[in-house]
Amino acid sequence: LKRVKNRSKQLLTLTEKTSKMKKIKNLALLMAIVLGLTFTSCTKDNTATIEEEETAVAPVGIPQDVFEKAQSLHFNTFDMQKTMFEKPGGKMEEAYLLEGDIMIPHDQLMAMEFGDGITSKQYRTSNLVSDGVITIIGYTANNSNGLTTKMQTGLQWAVDNYNALGLDISFQLTFGTNYQNKDMVVYQVSGGAGGSAGFPSGGNPNKWVRINSGLAPYSNNVHEHVIGHEIGHSIGFRHSDYFSRQSCGQNSNEGSAGVGAIHIPGTPTGWDPTSLMNACFSSSEDGEFNSNDITALRWMY
């Protein structure tokens, strides 16, 4: 009987030990699960934080969906601005100013798809203008949109520069107010020294070329330079220094602008300080193409 009792005690002790061990194992397993859940939760939180940090917030006044659309098209949105796009006669339309002188109406921007674009002079866009004659008019109405005498001279000189190269495109220039059926319209708007234009699409050049009233104090050569530059955008050229904007004293890449930034063979990949298509200009510009500009134009057209 004693032996049986002792055996029972031994069995009981063994059972208790086994039970305790199971409890310890279960507790350890539970702790491991809790720690695992805690670690997983932290990881998810960290991932969410990173994703939130990578989602840029639109500048004040620009809808988030519009801002994200511009980014998806690889525009440089650093100085993106919402503004009003003025047409001859004073009609206003909502637009966005990108990269200093690229003006795109709201509807056009939202309809753009990647690959719809342009290039710079020595970097071009993926969309070009169809070969042939481009009709261009200098708007001369007696109102705030009419070109000044200097602007008219600059436009004439700029068009002459393009036509002198014997390209597959040419410009037929007139002056007047009947612009509706013209391919391109060059007119004046209020603003600081400079101008703005858009990119070609569907084989057609950008139609609206705006020259700012703030250009008035500058020479005819500077007018020629600015107008020639904006015409360049309108037929498919990006800024020669799109990758750095060095001409503006900056160091920021404009992106591929939804129309590509395709390097043109035979032209520099680096800084070309005398190119007509640099992002910014000086008061000493002569308005002429340099040799790299000409190489780029002849390669494209």
Whereabouts are the PLM-identified features?
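Surface-exposed patches in mature extracellular/periplasmic domains of secreted proteins
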Residues: 165-179, 241-246
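Catalytic zinc-binding patch centered on the HExxH motif and its immediate surroundings
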Residues: 151, 179-208, 218
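Bacterial Sec-dependent N-terminal signal peptides
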Residues: 3, 10, 15-70
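Disordered inhibitory propeptide/activation segment of secreted metzincin zinc metalloprotease zymogens
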Residues: 47-147, 260-265
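Zn2+-dependent metallopeptidase catalytic core
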Residues: 147-172
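Short pre-active-site segment immediately N-terminal to the catalytic Zn-binding motif
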Residues: 211-227
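Short, low-complexity, Pro/Ser/Thr/Gly-rich segments in the mature regions of secreted, periplasmic
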Residues: 286-301
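The catalytic-center signature of Zn2+-dependent metalloproteases
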Residues: 221, 228-289
